[in-house]
């Protein structure tokens, strides 16, 4: 556990249409039922300021570096105003997306982008990384079918299968790079409840 906090920081990662937000909500409700102090938040967003930045990030076509800096600025506000205070009070913080999403969605568009994103994060908040990250592993073909069946509401939803594959393999690479922190939950053929039960086993 990181030394600046007393609580526990849990993040959910993966591409579009993989059930990540559903699992974040299910874990939040489970911990609430156990009378555990817990908050649920998301990125990009989580605070009034960061949510305004989110609107630009997910709807406007930005230059790659501008998009990365927008995401990092939103994260700094989110961490400073919400995540860190909650952790210091002993809460479990569940976050729907965090640093790995920035790596895969913004970092891949830049030269040496993976290292750049992690180094920027360390500069902004050197002691704050998740205690555990769940990568919800759903094959790109399955994920894009799910997205196509719902109302697509941002620029990432409407990108094609090549984009979905690129994002998917980025998350797989990161899960292999950080196996102690990032737990892969293979979810393509599982129900939401079955995925939830697998996640609970890691807590």
Curated annotation (Swiss-Prot):
**Pfam families xref list:** Thymidylate_kin (PF02223)
* Keyword Cytoplasm recorded: no
Q: Which UniProt keywords apply?
A: ATP-binding, Kinase, Nucleotide biosynthesis, Nucleotide-binding, Transferase
User: Top-level EC class, please?
Assistant: transferase
According to its UniProt record, the EC number is 2.7.4.9
GO biological process terms, semicolon-separated: dTDP biosynthetic process; dTTP biosynthetic process; dUDP biosynthetic process
* Chain positions recorded as ATP binding sites: 14-21
What top-level branch of life does the organism fall under? Bacteria
Q: Which reaction does it catalyse?
A: dTMP + ATP = dTDP + ADP
Alphabetized GO MF terms: ATP binding; dTMP kinase activity
An example Gene Ontology cellular component term from the record? cytosol
Which NCBIfam families does the UniProt entry name for this protein?
DTMP_kinase
The entry assigns this protein to a family as follows: Belongs to the thymidylate kinase family.
Q: Provide the function of this protein.
A: Phosphorylation of dTMP to form dTDP in both de novo and salvage pathways of dTTP synthesis.
Specify the protein name. Thymidylate kinase
What organism is this sequence from? Rickettsia conorii (strain ATCC VR-613 / Malish 7)
- Give the gene symbol: tmk
């Amino acid at each position: 556990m990181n030394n600046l906090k007393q609580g526990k920081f849990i993040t959910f990662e993966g591409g579009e249409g993989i059930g990540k937000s559903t699992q974040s909500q299910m874990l939040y409700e489970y911990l609430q039922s156990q009378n555990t102090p817990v908050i649920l938040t998301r990125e990009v967003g989580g605070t009034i300021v960061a949510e305004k930045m989110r609107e630009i990030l997910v709807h406007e076509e930005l230059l790659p570096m501008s998009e990365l800096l927008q995401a990092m600025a939103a994260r700094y506000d989110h961490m400073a105003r919400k995540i860190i205070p909650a952790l210091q009070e002993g809460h479990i913080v569940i976050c729907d997306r965090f640093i790995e999403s920035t790596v895969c969605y913004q970092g891949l568009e830049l030269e040496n982008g993976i290292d750049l994103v992690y180094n920027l994060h360390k500069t902004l908040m050197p002691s704050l990384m998740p205690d555990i990250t769940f990568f919800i592993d759903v094959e790109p073909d399955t994920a894009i079918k799910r997205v196509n069946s719902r109302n697509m509401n941002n620029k990432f939803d409407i990108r094609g299968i090549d984009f979905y594959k690129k994002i998917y393999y980025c998350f797989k690479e990161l899960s292999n790079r950080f196996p102690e922190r990032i737990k892969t939950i293979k979810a393509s053929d599982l129900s939401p409840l079955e995925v939830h039960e697998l996640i609970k086993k890691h807590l």
